[in-house]
């Protein structure tokens, strides 16, 4: 009996102790009203800190991409759609540096040597020289000629120079160029501003030395010439500010180790002695101040003793009816195939199609129109990623986005709508050659799109001019990385709204290729290789092999074996042999056990 009563007593004590532990603290609070109640923090007031960029991870560079370490321990892989690095003599990736430095002896502004590439601009036009682009042992030097020089060069041996005509048969009426015109080096754009406070932004990720721009004012009355060195390319813009008697412009291209040939699409390809395409000049187009554009501009070439005369001729009827200034846009591009989409090996292809011009191909344009407009009709943008950004083996994708820059020009946001919703869709059509498919695509033969599923949308307003807009692609990109043959192609469509279509036609102008604000494809990931504090593991002893860790989230196995250590109050250290299951490969020769690294 005594034992039974004692057991009951113990049970009561334990029950009371348990009740005291789980009772709310307020039950024991003092009744003294002078003690203020504890401040309650609303959930809305608790915000996660912005994820900023700590710095670049140089070891993970590629020709067109960079990797950045983020403040939360994750990483960001960025593809710029064009080369931003070159390999040095040691095989290491270095930033392309187009910063201009004045060289007194050459009387020129010269970029750094980016591997085999270098570009130079004349300080003035006293000798008619404009710019030189060199790649290895080959080069192209561009210059102007006074009418007397031009007539002498183009005249038939039996013809009087005064009777000479241009390659397209027109009289040579071009005025003298302004030999006193001096170069103006334009201010470089604000780029690569890595911040940990406000979070990362697409406009802050552009490499800071990728481009430089110079301007020659009043080369001809009412005509300026602007040149931009970006990546490995040289872009020229003929800026016509007022009406002219003629819209024909002749340039002497002195070629070293190169020969020129006109292509069926109106472009010019420069090949070396082995037949390799070194440079190309895409078929030109022109655009006025209101955004109206035309392809009524063409090239003709005529071989001369030390190169070619390249004649650019624009349709006077179109130019005279346009809103000035009118910009005529030829570009000298490294390794060209077709137009401004550069090369079939490039990491990104961007173009658009318009219902208002259903048979027109727009792949030669530097910019893309999205929305609804009077000239192009309904505009769809297409983006193909020619391969996904490289991420380390074993890493997990946590986010992805595609970002495009909205032009600051007067037609950057054009129309009556206060806002323009743009939706992102997956392209369902696959192709054996996406490059050829897209450079020959018009509205009538556009790629098929899954319009039943909106992946993401963004709403654009006038305030977005001069900034990047973006779309979240996380779910789709995860599928791409898991697939063996993904299409890696998306389309950007305006929202379908009858009232919007009828009354509020609006388009935006975003850049498909630009030296300062190229499209940015960004993939966020976490590197799960090794032991990370934000994951949980099942830990077990592995005897002499060390300690084994099995990741709860991924199932990856890690084994850590300490091989050396030094105890010190000043600078202690340890060296571990780390096995990661994701690194395991079958190999007949290795300096470490298969799947292992030194940490």
Predicted features along the sequence, with ranges:
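Intrinsically disordered, low-complexity segments enriched in small residues
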Residues: 5, 30-91, 214, 221, ...
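C-terminal segment of classical bacterial N-terminal signal peptides
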Residues: 19-28
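Residues that cap or anchor secondary-structure elements
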Residues: 33-335, 515
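Extended extracellular/luminal ectodomain segments enriched in beta-structured repeat modules
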Residues: 243-248, 377-380, 390-402
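A short beta-strand element within beta-rich, extracytoplasmic domains
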Residues: 249-255, 385, 395-409
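Short beta-strand-plus-loop segments that form exposed binding edges in beta-rich domains
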Residues: 314-319, 492-512
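Flexible, small-residue-rich N-terminal segments that precede or flank a structured functional core
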Residues: 327-390, 409, 428, 444, ...
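Beta-strand-rich interaction/scaffold domains
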Residues: 406-481, 486
């Amino acid at each position: 009996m005594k034992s039974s009563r004692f057991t009951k007593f113990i049970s009561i004590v334990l029950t009371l102790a348990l009740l005291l532990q789980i009772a709310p603290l307020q039950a024991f609070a003092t009744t003294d009203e002078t003690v203020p109640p504890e401040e309650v923090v609303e959930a809305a007031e608790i915000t996660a800190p912005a994820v900023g960029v700590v710095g670049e991870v140089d070891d993970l560079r590629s020709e067109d991409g960079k990797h950045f370490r983020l403040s939360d321990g994750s990483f960001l892989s960025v593809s710029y759609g064009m080369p931003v690095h070159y390999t040095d003599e040691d095989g290491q990736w270095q930033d392309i540096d187009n910063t201009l430095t004045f060289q007194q002896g050459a009387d020129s502004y010269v970029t750094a040597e980016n591997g085999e590439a270098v570009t130079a601009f004349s300080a003035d036009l006293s000798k008619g020289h404009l710019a030189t682009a060199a790649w290895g042992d080959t080069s192209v030097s561009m210059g102007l000629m006074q009418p007397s020089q031009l007539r002498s060069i183009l005249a038939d041996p039996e013809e009087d120079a005064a009777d000479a005509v241009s390659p397209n048969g027109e009289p040579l009426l071009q005025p003298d160029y302004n030999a006193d015109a001096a170069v103006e080096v334009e201010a470089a754009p604000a780029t690569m501003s890595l911040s940990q406070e406000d979070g990362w932004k697409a406009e802050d990720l552009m490499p800071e030395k990728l481009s430089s721009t110079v301007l020659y004012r009043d080369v001809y009355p009412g005509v300026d010439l602007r040149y931009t060195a970006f990546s490995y390319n040289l872009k020229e813009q003929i800026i016509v500010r007022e009406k002219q008697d003629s819209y024909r412009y002749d340039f002497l291209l002195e070629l070293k180790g190169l020969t020129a040939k006109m292509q069926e699409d109106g472009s010019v390809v420069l090949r070396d002695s082995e037949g390799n395409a070194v440079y190309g000049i895409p078929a030109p187009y022109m655009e006025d101040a209101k955004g109206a554009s035309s392809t009524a501009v063409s090239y003709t070439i005529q071989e001369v003793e030390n190169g070619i005369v390249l004649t650019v001729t624009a349709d006077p009827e179109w130019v005279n009816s346009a809103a000035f200034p009118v910009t005529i846009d030829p570009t000298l591009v490294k390794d060209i195939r077709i137009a401004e989409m550069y090369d079939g090996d490039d990491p990104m292809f961007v173009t658009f199609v318009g219902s208002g011009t259903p048979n027109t191909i727009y792949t030669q344009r530097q910019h893309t129109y999205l929305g609804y407009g009077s000239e192009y009709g309904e505009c769809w943008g297409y983006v193909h990623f020619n391969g996904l950004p490289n991420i380390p083996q074993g890493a997990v994708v946590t986010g992805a986005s595609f970002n495009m820059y909205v032009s600051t020009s007067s037609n950057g946001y054009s129309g009556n709508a206060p806002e323009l919703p743009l939706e992102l869709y997956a392209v369902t059509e696959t192709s054996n050659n996406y490059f050829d498919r897209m450079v020959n695509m018009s509205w009538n033969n556009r790629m098929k799109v899954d319009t039943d599923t909106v992946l993401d949308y963004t709403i654009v307003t006038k305030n977005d001019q001069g900034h990047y807009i973006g779309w979240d692609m996380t779910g789709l990109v995860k599928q791409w990385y898991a697939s063996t043959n993904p299409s890696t192609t998306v389309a950007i469509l305006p929202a379908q709204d009858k009232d919007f279509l009828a009354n509020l036609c609006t388009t935006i102008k975003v850049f498909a290729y630009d030296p300062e604000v190229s499209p940015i494809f960004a993939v966020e990931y976490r590197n799960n290789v090794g032991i990370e504090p934000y994951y949980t593991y099942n830990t077990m002893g592995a005897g002499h092999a060390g300690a084994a860790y099995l990741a709860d989230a991924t199932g990856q196995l890690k084994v850590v074996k300490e091989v050396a250590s030094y105890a010190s109050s000043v600078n202690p250290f340890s060296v571990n042999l780390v096995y990661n299951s994701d690194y395991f490969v079958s190999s007949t020769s290795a300096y470490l056990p298969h799947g292992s690294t030194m940490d």
